[in-house]
Regions:
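Positively charged n-region of N-terminal signal peptides that target proteins for export
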Residues: 1-4, 447
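Bacterial N-terminal signal peptides
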Residues: 4-16
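Active-site neighborhoods of metal-dependent hydrolases
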Residues: 443-444, 458, 516-521, 533
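Extracytoplasmic/lumenal domain signature
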Residues: 55-68, 100-123, 137, 141-143, ...
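Segments forming glycine/polar-rich beta-alpha architectures that bind adenosine-containing cofactors
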Residues: 433-464, 469-471
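Repeat-blade elements of multi-bladed beta-propeller folds
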Residues: 31-35, 77-97, 125-158, 192-218, ...
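N-terminal pre-domain segments of enzymes
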Residues: 17-49, 378-406, 412, 486-490
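Mature N-terminal segment immediately following signal peptide/propeptide cleavage
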Residues: 22-70, 83-86, 522-523
Length: 640
């Protein structure tokens, strides 16, 4: 098998501490972090499965977790977004109920399970979800319990340290193996508004977490602090505040997505969210640094190294949802360590990893101003000179879309009543088209970087949103209509501002988006040139419509891709229930495997068994908010 020779930098960031007897080849065959390596590349050096034989992939095993909720019994709907890890001969994964399972990676048989016993009936703003767990091995200990640990951050904001061999909580960590992450955080006023959804980051003897905070509830949202804890004891080592604490009442700016780590440079990279609330900023004047940014901190001290803001004074929920991807850019005969950062606007920023300076250049361009009383929108926003925007940046009545003339005309009439001056059109009482909407562009799925080919592959959404500011004296009837189901929109109060808000996909009477398809795409960017190599629709509406004649390519999507040395990109994500393999260099679809439920998760790949067989695994449990078929499956594929 051909294995890509990793650079020293890549190897240090990709492989955690292993016991003395573990072979380096075993480490390369692992998927040791949520995104494959600590730098978020989503790349595997395995090529046993490749372009010539991927068509032969078959299901190897299927595991049922039993953890699924359709919302009919009062519990939130489940969202199976986890990506397993494989390290130290075991697969570790989390479920929507936040349980942890240890599994034999060759057979799919369960070794142990751990239940943190979250309240399944709590109104969590993010639903029932957990994206993954993190492995850590103590380099100073050779034997004994909890030498190797699994860190789990739960939806009810607790951090657990578990013995990787048994699943038992590590008694020397926090209190009985857990930490209450709500402790020390200001302005938490109800259960379910301060949460954890992503896998923690680890570097040296630190475990680092951000938080997920409910959007649009009020001005004084909880503090979005990022904190590092001692991986052995659970003691707080440092905290960093994206929004300075003295800027009350503004909160949030939190890091709810995955943190990336550069072990060689001793740096961590944070994708920060929006300041509160998302759609009205009169109590948070200015750019609101360091919200809506990618930020580099010293891992040892938590001190700011550099920051780069992707959106000034956010009014669109354009938080930095994608994990920063670390790689090496080869261009014009030189190599540059970079951070590749996408965001919901559909723009892709490539920054020098050490300085935060744009590699291709960025310019501040004028954008529409706000006509809402008290709102001082930023007059400019940053746009990268390269690559070009991945998503369309404006929707007008001229390109209103419908599946038939009546549907198109209904969309056109609706759009005529809404403000649409291009991307960054400010929210208004009249109503505004936000395009791209708050689903992106790029979302938490991020993208995958094949460094040998210099190709960055990502999925995007091309969905318009209809956003309204609701004067305070008109808000209660709108909220009641939403609660009763007579209004389809998501409605939030934005307490502390003069306006509530509503948002929904800008749709036709049949419920289809008013923008032209594809509504979801898979795109490859050649970073050596800063240009788009190829783009293809992702998925079809075949599982959403009864008439095959009305199947449309390119659906909304959540999840993400991985890339391999075998020249393959694996991704599910779309609203049809398939895992697909694409040729990374051309975008040609080479294979697809039917899933029993929605695949709104990122796949992963690894070697297992005496002969080192390559498997590709994905969680197929659907997504309550996206509306795909729910289930509880984890499925592994391999060659016969």
């Amino acid at each position: 098998m051909r294995l890509l020779v990793l650079t020293a930098i890549g190897l240090m960031s990709a492989i955690p501490h292993f016991a003395a007897g573990e072979a380096r080849s075993e480490a390369i065959g692992n998927w040791a972090f949520y995104a494959g390596d600590a730098g978020g590349s989503r790349y595997s050096p395995l090529d046993q499965i490749n372009k010539t034989n991927v068509v032969e992939l078959k299901p190897a095993w299927e595991l049922h977790t039993g953890d699924v909720s359709d919302g009919s019994d009062g519990r939130p709907k489940s969202e199976f977004e986890t990506t397993p890890i494989v390290v130290a001969g075991t697969m570790f994964l989390s479920t929507p109920f936040n349980r942890v399972l240890a599994v034999d990676p060759e057979t799919g048989k369960e070794k142990w399970s751990f239940d943190p016993k979250i309240d399944l009936r709590e109104h969590y703003s993010e639903g029932l979800v957990n994206r993954g767990v993190t492995f850590w091995s103590d380099p100073g200990v050779t034997d004994g319990p909890c030498r190797q640990r699994i860190f789990l951050a739960t939806i009810d904001a607790r951090l657990f340290a578990l013995d990787a061999l048994t699943g038992h909580p590590c008694s020397d960590f926090g209190i009985g193996g857990q930490i209450d992450l709500k402790a020390g955080i200001a302005n938490i006023k109800r259960g379910g508004e301060y949460e954890e959804t992503s896998a923690p980051a680890v570097i040296d003897d630190l475990v680092i977490v951000g938080s997920s905070i409910a959007d649009n509830d009020r001005v004084d949202s909880p503090d979005g602090a990022v904190r590092a804890f001692d991986a052995k004891t659970g003691k707080l080592r440092w905290s960093w505040h994206p929004i300075p604490e003295n800027l009350a009442p503004t909160g949030a700016g939190n890091v709810w997505s995955t943190i990336s780590v550069d072990a060689q440079r001793g740096m961590v990279f944070l994708p920060t969210g929006s300041a509160s609330p998302d759609y009205h900023g009169f109590k948070r004047p200015g750019d609101n640094k360091w919200a809506n940014s990618v930020v580099a901190l010293s891992a040892r001290t938590g001190e700011l190294v550099w920051g780069f803001q992707l959106v000034h004074h956010d009014l669109w929920d354009y938080d930095t949802a994608a994990q920063p991807v670390l790689g090496v850019l080869r261009r014009e005969g030189s190599e540059t360590p970079v951070v590749i950062q996408g965001n919901k606007t559909g723009n892709l920023f490539v920054l020098n990893r050490e300085t935060g300076k744009p590699v291709f250049g960025v310019e501040e361009r004028p954008v529409p101003r706000s006509d809402t009383e008290g709102e001082d929108a930023s007059p400019t926003q940053p746009f990268p000179l390269l690559p070009p925007p991945l998503a369309p940046l404006q929707l007008t009545t001229n390109n209103a879309w419908g599946i038939n003339p009546e549907e198109r005309e209904a969309c056109r009439v609706k759009m005529e009543k809404l403000k649409s001056e291009g991307i960054f059109t400010a929210p208004s009482v009249q109503g505004t088209i936000a395009f791209p909407g708050n689903l992106g562009g790029m979302n938490w799925s991020s993208g995958a970087f094949d460094q040998s080919r210099q190709l960055f592959v990502t999925n995007i959404n091309n969905l318009p949103m209809e956003v309204h500011l609701i004067p305070r004296d008109q808000y209660k009837p709108v909220e009641k209509a939403a609660q009763q189901g007579t209004l389809r929109a998501e409605v939030s109060p934005q307490h502390g501002t003069p306006y509530g808000m509503s948002r929904e996909v800008l749709h036709s009477p049949l419920g289809l988006p008013c923008s032209p398809p594809p509504w979801g795409e898979l795109i490859a960017i050649d970073l050596s040139k800063g240009s788009i190599r190829w783009r293809v629709p992702l998925g079809t509406t075949a599982d959403m419509v009864k008439d095959p004649a009305h199947v449309i390519p390119g659906t909304p999507n959540l999840g993400g891709p991985i890339v391999t040395a075998g020249g393959l990109t694996f991704i599910a994500s779309a609203m049809d229930n398939y895992l697909r393999a694409f040729d990374t260099e051309t975008g040609q679809e080479l294979w697809k495997g039917r899933l029993p439920a929605g695949g709104q998760a990122m796949p992963m790949t690894y070697l297992a068994g005496q002969n080192g067989k390559q498997f590709v695994v994905i969680a197929a449990g659907g997504h309550g908010k996206l509306g795909t078929k729910l289930g509880d499956s984890v499925i592994a594929y391999s060659l016969p």
